Amino acid sequence: MFKMKFGDTLPRSDFGTGGNKQAPGLELG
């Protein structure tokens, strides 16, 4: 679904699916 690299750009990512997932977030898609 949200295949974006939010984990890279944001310290806290709600959509850390496509990111580096450094912070616990909602895994969508």
Swiss-Prot record:
Q: Name the domain of life this protein comes from.
A: Eukaryota
Region entry Disordered, spans: 1-29
Protein name listed in UniProt: Uncharacterized protein YMR242W-A
Annotated organism of origin: Saccharomyces cerevisiae (strain ATCC 204508 / S288c)
